[in-house]
Amino acid sequence: FSLYVTDVEPAFTLGEMAKMKNDSILKLKSEKVFDLNKQKKLPLLPKRIAVISVETSRGYQDFIITINNYHKKFALELSLFEATLQGDNAITTIVRALQKIASRIDDFDVVTIIRGGAGDTGLACYDEYALAKEVACFPIPIVTGIGHATNETVTEMVAFKNCITPTAAADFFLEKFYAQDILINQLSEKLINSVSQSLND
């Protein structure tokens, strides 16, 4: 007797994944932790960034290239905490990285979870309650940039800020510094003009 599989019906698996995602959302909301990370205060200039990623990943490289364009000017401090970002080991390693960061929480202003180059595959771990709760309850803001553009995962929903790509996450941080840089230049110009006018009067 031989069995040949000619087709696979993904509806059951997709249905299970959708149920898991919905269950995670409902549980986090019932525990009143769903919006906790969004309520954290991001420093005006978040220069000390803990990065959860893989050093050799395309997403991390995109993030670093963008940051490095202004790294010296804005004196950003990046600390990499490596983790598996998809698949069976993702939850365990990301949670472990978060715990390491938490043990040094005074050293950081913000955390960013960076993943890119793999499309929408392997994202189920980000809908898991265990990971989403760690992010929701983390003591400082978490910014996600896990590199996909379709359905938002639960982890992205509960994070302080969800950026579609690692590059967008880098831009999010840099924009904070751009804004202050412009403001300082404007104030400096006003001060110079004011002093010049006073000397001429």
Residue ranges of predicted features:
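Short, glycine/charged-enriched hinge/interface segments at domain edges or termini
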Residues: 1-81
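Short glycine/threonine-rich loop/turn motifs
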Residues: 50-201
